[in-house]
Amino acid sequence: MAEPKNILFIMFDQLRFDYLSCAGHPHLHTPHIDWLASKGVRFTQCYVQSPVCGASRMSSYTGRYVSSHGASWNGVPLKVGEWTMGDHLRQLGMDALLLGKTHMRADAEGMRRLGLAPDSIIGARLSECGFDPIIRDDGLWAFGPDGAYDDQESPYNAFLRAEGYDADNPWHDYANAGIDNEGNIASGWLYENARRPANIREEDSETPWLTRQMIKFLEQDAPGRERPWMCHLSYIKPHWPYIVPAPYHDMYGPDSHKPVVRDARELENPHPIYVAFTDNAIGQAFRRDDVREAALGAYMGLIKQIDDQMGVLFKHLEASGQLDETMIVITSDHGDYMGDHWLGEKDLFHEPSVKVPLIVYDPSPAADATRGTVCDALVESIDLLPTFVEVAGGMPRMEMLEGYSLLPLLRNAKVTGPREFTISEYDYSVTPMAARLGVAPRDARLFMMRDARWKFIHAEGGFAPMLFDLDSDPDELIDLGRDPAYAAVRDACYDKLFSWARRPSQRTTVSDQQLIDRRGKSRRKGIVLGVNTADEIDAELLEKYQGKARQSHGE
């Protein structure tokens, strides 16, 4: 093996941390992802910086917390001026490429204000979150009475039409729908159809299609590149709609499902924000056993298909000799409740939502000692970008980056983790739950602090906090946020959260070292303060202020 030349950054959408066999799932076997874990390090305590697609991804792509980059929800633009993965890596001689989804919304107003044309190189990169896209496809081509969810063109839809799938929106009508007994479209948006096979050839469904694009790049483009590359291979699945083509649609019946994690005690005097989410349409749907069983079977089938495609990809990397020069990362942007805690989707901070898988394969000989190991250190998604910077031969710019490089953990099994606690944020101001609670947008915010024992959630808007003891209650069933016996614990948690909140990285244009180097330099540029007489300082510091006056304008 050799030092990594390239980086393959694989992100799945809505993949839970515990739905891999290497993470202990008893029925869902993922041998290809397990194989990568056997060659690298599997991190068991990786947390995203927001449990919603857009905000989480913007944190991964900038290496910054949501409060710092500001793109707090899907469709909220990442402001012009935020450095992204591409900005950091390109200046080190590494290209930053994209295949798949980013959920990035360009700051069109900011670009207009600065006179940046969208079709210029810099304008295109600002619009694509700093990546040079090979293919950008965000994978949600939904249409309703008010129009399209995403107004971009879909490369995947173009592919399906070229393959003969006849529809205005083949993404829905074939890849994400089945056929009912009368020959009608059975939409994957309806949970009752999750047991049906999607009406598409398996090889034409989204995950194999994107995998083929990656292999095409590896075969046709990568070998001739003069510069090393980081390619973000970003899959839409196993994100909803919950429907999958044959043979995956009926692989996982109820006997293979993990028991739902929920308890009636969670609904006794519950926190009002928690109630708002359990009582929404998604939470109510996933209380039903038939809904959970149908959706979970399809979800597991989608993950099995993902693993099979990882096998295809890894086999190609190995056969082409590129495996030994490519760092490979597998992770997700958030999880999926799947009925746990009386919830569906993601959004809140229980483990199924905010904790994600993270597997890193580092081909460097320096990582040989950690191959096949498990790391329980608290890490965050924002740690990936500083890791990539170091792999590219640079030093992370810590005035901007708020994560820590994982290379010490990848290359030294005895190193402890970089942090005492992790942080995640959630801005729910755009959701109906904020309206139900009567919360103004500025107050519709949640902050999670999770340390070795406690998970603490602060809610703006005058709400009480939430608190879970992960030692005695690892399933997070008992909220101690209003229990007087835990007042001291809550105070200690607030101290940790405040220690994070008062140190945002907003001074991004000057490094710490530049500030250190400037100490005292103003005196040598003529700013002479704190001096009474000339003999108190070096004569050269007053040289420009001495000599005969050329004119006299006084009396």
Positions of the model-derived regions?
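A contiguous, mid-protein "functional segment" used to position or interact
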Residues: 484-523
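Formylglycine-dependent sulfatase
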Residues: 1-457, 465, 474-478, 482-495, ...
